[in-house]
Curated annotation (Swiss-Prot):
Domain Radical SAM core residue range list: 137-375
Catalytic reaction list: L-aspartate(89)-[ribosomal protein uS12]-hydrogen + (sulfur carrier)-SH + AH2 + 2 S-adenosyl-L-methionine = 3-methylsulfanyl-L-aspartate(89)-[ribosomal protein uS12]-hydrogen + (sulfur carrier)-H + 5'-deoxyadenosine + L-methionine + A + S-adenosyl-L-homocysteine + 2 H(+)
Main location: cytoplasm
UniProt record, GO biological process: tRNA modification
Classification via PANTHER family: RIBOSOMAL PROTEIN S12 METHYLTHIOTRANSFERASE RIMO (PTHR43837), RIBOSOMAL PROTEIN US12 METHYLTHIOTRANSFERASE RIMO (PTHR43837:SF1)
Keyword Iron-sulfur carried by entry: yes
Details of cofactor binding: Binds 2 [4Fe-4S] clusters. One cluster is coordinated with 3 cysteines and an exchangeable S-adenosyl-L-methionine.
Gene field: rimO
Matching SMART domains: Elp3
Protein name as it appears in the record: Ribosomal protein uS12 methylthiotransferase RimO
Length: 443
């Protein structure tokens, strides 16, 4: 009497940024198409894949810790992702890992899984229940859309180009077809991600591709125009403040894409920006922000900054605080500088900022920006907003407005049971706010 072969099972841990999450989704989609079952525990898996982060040393430490945990609990571990470019460092700590690959090495990861636990020979991918949009690790109502790999910048604090390579833009027709599948599957919000969204298409000289039989240039403006036709929220992340960003502001003002820009300014002091090898035109940037807001008063700007970069003086830091007062950014994150192995900043010969000074500056930065953010959110009280529901709890619902990207920004809280479910879009009036969150009532 024949028996049905057991379904091969894979455990998966995804660390790091949304771009790494998209890599994980691609690998999982391929494995699911080949009949593998993805399981949530180490003990139920035949093999575990760990998609690592290698952006800063603390992320590497977390990656090594998770690899060790997977080895202890399962024993069969495949490593991929950004830290995978440092195979020696990984094998020095965990010599028993079965395979180590870098980011975007989808085929190699799948092949490594095959070697440990081959796919079932009787599996028919034509009848497998893999959705057309692939496997997604986000809630059903929003998804990340990665438009390119790599980066052409050489920021002194960053090693991403050495891990992910130079900019490689995905064909715009392919990107738009993926977005269309996502929306048809119920996605209400598309979060556009890359290492440098504003540079999309530079590497292919903005060549024309085709989507649904019509020509579309491989460029941020044309991509946004096409995405706006799908009927979902479109949110732009990792945008550099280049002149071509001016072109998408009218789309935001017209309500075609969300009036939201995620721009990693990193600092404001010209001296520090020069050391970071970042664009050092802070005065032009302020003028650009003012111009954007004149065209689109609803515009929300989120950014991230680094304090305590080598050579940063109290004067530089105060310059940054003054710049924040001028810029009036809405959503801001801040990190204390942490040396990254292999980063050019290590060789600049600049004075290190003591840890206690970094902490003190971080505290001052956060207090300064929280006051700005709180004041800006207070201006929303009494106004109407659309809220996309993320969670429904016993005491009420939690969602987000155009102000709020998932995971990194604030939330909108709606008290009471209104019968909402995740993915619903609800028109509300803001009744209260603090420095991060808003409270609203359905209209």
């Amino acid at each position: 009497m024949s028996t049905t072969p057991a379904t091969p099972k894979v455990g998966f841990v995804s660390l790091g940024c949304p771009k790494a999450l998209v890599d994980s989704e691609r690998i999982l989609t391929q494995l699911r198409m080949e009949g593998y079952e993805v399981v949530p525990t180490y003990e139920d898996a035949d093999v575990v894949v760990v998609n690592t982060c290698g952006f800063i040393d603390s992320a590497k430490a977390e990656s090594l810790e998770v690899i060790g945990e997977a080895i202890k609990e399962n024993g069969k571990v495949i490593v991929t992702g950004c830290m995978g470019v440092e195979e020696g460092s990984i094998r020095d700590v965990h010599p028993s890992v079965l395979s180590v690959t870098g980011p975007q090495q989808y085929e190699q990861v799948v092949n490594a899984v095959h070697e440990v636990v081959p796919p079932r020979q009787d599996h028919n991918p034509l009848i497998d229940l893999v959705p057309p949009q692939g496997v997604k690790l986000t809630p059903r109502h929003y998804a990340y859309l990665k438009i390119s790999e790599g980066c052409n910048h050489s920021c002194s604090f960053c090693i991403i180009p050495s891990m992910r390579g130079k900019l490689v833009s995905r064909p715009v027709g392919e990107v738009l077809s993926e977005a269309e599948r996502l929306v048809k599957a119920g996605v209400k919000e598309i979060l556009v991600i890359s290492q440098d969204t504003s540079a999309y298409g530079v590497d292919v000289k903005y060549k024309t591709d085709f989507w649904n039989g019509r020509p579309v240039k491989t460029r941020m403006l044309e991509l946004c125009e096409a995405l706006s036709s799908l009927g979902a929220w479109v949110r732009l992340h990792y945008v550099y403040p280049y002149p071509n960003v001016d072109d998408v502001i009218p789309l935001m003002a017209a309500g075609k894409i969300l009036p939201y820009l995620d721009i990693p300014f990193q600092h404001a002091s010209p001296k520090v920006l020069k050391s970071m090898k970042r664009p050092a035109f802070e005065d032009r940037t302020l003028a650009r922000i003012k111009n954007w807001r004149e065209q689109c008063p609803e515009l929300v700007i989120r950014s991230t900054f680094i304090v305590g970069f080598p050579g940063e003086t109290e004067e530089d830091f105060q310059y940054l605080l003054d710049w924040l007062t001028e810029a009036q950014l809405d959503r801001v994150g801040c990190f204390q500088y942490s040396p990254v192995e292999g980063a050019p900043a290590n060789d600049l010969g600049l004075a290190e900022v003591p840890d206690d000074v970094k902490q003190e500056r971080w505290d001052r930065f956060m207090a300064h920006q929280q006051a700005i953010s709180a004041a800006r959110l207070q201006l929303r009280i009494g106004k109407e907003i659309d809220v996309l529901i993320d969670e429904v709890e016993e005491q009420g619902s939690v969602g987000r407005s155009f102000f709020d990207a998932p995971e990194i920004d604030g939330s909108v809280f709606i008290d009471g049971d209104h019968g909402f479910k995740p993915g619903d879009k609800v028109r509300c009036r803001v009744v209260d706010a603090d420095e991060y969150d808003m409270w609203a009532e359905p209209i």
